[in-house]
Each structure stands twice: as structure tokens, then as C-alpha cells.
Amino acid sequence: MKVDKSMNKMEEFNYTVEQFADLQLLRYKVYGFEELSLKQKELIYYLSQAALQGRDILFDQNGKYNLLIRKMLETVYTEYQGDRTDVNFVNLETYLKRIWFSNGIHHHYASDKFVPGFTPEFLRDALNSVDALKLPLGKGKQWKNFVKKSFR
């Protein structure tokens, strides 16, 4: 692998991508990626896709409803047409990010269940506002029963 001569220069690079709740997300430079062959980049792509599938398995193993909750909230997050600056939506976003980071609805260290910062009414209205066919509930299931069971 060729060493990029610019690596020796002090560059300003923001390693912190985002902070929320008690978490800080970092990113890193991957020197030499541009010099990889197309075949090597393709391998990295397929490994990343395998990791995403493994992530779903981990979510499922960490809790019976984790995957369903994540997919439901992701649907609300991507399809919601309301005010995204509303405190309830902002809190839903933070809750979803915590779920992504911890691979489920429990804290990654303390194992405490996350408490949503949005109201049940907001979630109900948000779920009503999205196409029900996009929600991951399965045939004949209703989100109303699921929400009662999952968020108590």
C-alpha cells in the first residue's frame, strides 16, 4: 500500500460525528483506500453488507422485540411528514440512535431499558401518519397492540 505523503501534514479533521444522550460517535480516516483495487473495494462492500445482516441477528438475539421496534421507529423516522423540529420527534430520533448504537432497547453497559422521551400520543399519531404497509408487523398484526406491549 502506498503511503500518502499528505499523512505527514497536520490536517484539521473532525473526528466527532455526533453526540447524543451519553454517546459520542467518532469517525476515522482510512488512509490508502483510494489506492485499493476495484476487487478489494468490492470485497469491503460485501463485508459491510454481511455486517449489516449480522447486525439484525444481534438485534434479534438481544431481545424479542428489538428488531421490530427498530424497524418500526426507522419507518416513522424516514416517512414522518410532520414537524421534525418538534421536541417529540427530536426525542424519537435520539431514542432511535440509542437503539442503533446499543443494538437494542437496553443500554449497552448498564442494561437499563431506554425510556422514550416522546409521548405515547406522539408515537400513535406518527404511526397513523405513515403507510401501514411499510410497518414491519406481519400479516394480520396491528401496531396498536404491539406498541402497548413493547413500550410499557
Where are each of the predicted segments found?
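Short, Lys/Arg-enriched N-terminal segments with co-localized hydrophobic residues
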Residues: K2-M7
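N-terminal helix-rich structural modules
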Residues: N8-R152
